[in-house]
């Protein structure tokens, strides 16, 4: 039995070059870097049934002295709900206007991500809600009765993934609200969140409503909360988002 020597062995690049007639590209120099030990700004999923206080928690956060600015993108049936919460003492939430299409909603979000942060505290971006936003994307993709098929849905999911990547560029915490089908039972609710199927896994923190203005920390990808969350869901009571951000080290996230 004979074996190829390292100098005579045919590489995959050589095979591709032979079949396409194109010379293989020069190998790209790859680099590594050490871990920074600093957490990125968190993506928080705030999930619960209708009228349990998700939007209220956002508006109340804007009144907290630790929050310099809170911008809210209302989508679909959730539009207009935030206005009533302007009566909360000290509430300073700002509504981001758009025309309701996927293109304009995401353009508005990109503009928020690229804007200069307001000094003096946390900048927070809220998408209220992710359920309606996923419905907008899905509906537009199927416009005219188009049957997407597996390949088409893969493209839709890829577009959603790109959207989440944009959210990661925001200079502060991002909160996405979502609806949950049926009763809000933490043990099995993650499978019933009405939005893109992977959202609970792509976000860093999942907060679940268990009743009117009663919330539970269902999961967290955070060293700061790992010891707490390890023992199971943690009751948060009436959610104070600024407290959660502080526990997550959001004021230090992304610091150079």
Where are these regions (language model features)?
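C-terminal regions of RecA-like/P-loop NTPase motor modules
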Residues: 2-30, 36-42, 213-256
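Conserved P-loop
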Residues: 25-121
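Residue-level signature of catalytic and energy-coupling elements of molecular machines
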Residues: 72, 128, 203
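P-loop NTPase motor domains
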Residues: 104-123, 132-137, 230-249
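P-loop NTPase motor core
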Residues: 124-197
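Phosphate-binding/switch region of NTP-binding enzymes
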Residues: 165-241
């Amino acid at each position: 039995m004979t074996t190829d020597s390292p100098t005579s062995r045919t590489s995959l690049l050589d095979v591709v070059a032979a079949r396409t007639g194109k010379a293989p590209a020069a190998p790209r120099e790859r680099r590594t870097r050490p871990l920074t030990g600093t957490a990125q700004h968190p993506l928080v999923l705030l999930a619960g049934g209708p009228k349990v206080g998700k939007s209220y928690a956002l508006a109340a956060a804007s009144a907290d002295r630790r929050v310099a600015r809170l911008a809210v993108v209302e989508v679909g049936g959730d539009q207009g709900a935030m206005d009533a919460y302007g009566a909360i003492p000290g509430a300073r939430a700002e509504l981001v206007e758009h025309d309701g299409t996927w293109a304009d909603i995401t353009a508005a979000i990109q503009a928020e991500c690229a804007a200069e942060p307001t000094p003096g505290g946390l900048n927070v971006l809220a998408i209220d809600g992710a359920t309606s936003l996923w419905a907008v994307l899905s509906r537009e993709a199927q416009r005219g009765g188009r049957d997407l098929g597996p390949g088409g849905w893969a493209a839709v999911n890829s577009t959603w993934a790109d959207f989440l990547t944009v959210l990661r560029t925001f200079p502060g915490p991002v909160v996405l609200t979502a609806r949950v089908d049926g009763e809000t039972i933490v043990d099995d609710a993650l499978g019933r969140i009405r939005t893109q199927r992977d959202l609970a896994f792509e976000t860093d923190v999942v907060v679940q409503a268990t009743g009117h203005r009663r919330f539970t920390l269902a999961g967290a990808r955070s060293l700061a909360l790992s010891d707490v969350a390890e023992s199971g869901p943690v009751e948060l009571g009436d959610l104070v988002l600024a407290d959660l951000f502080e526990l997550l080290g959001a004021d230090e996230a992304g610091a150079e």
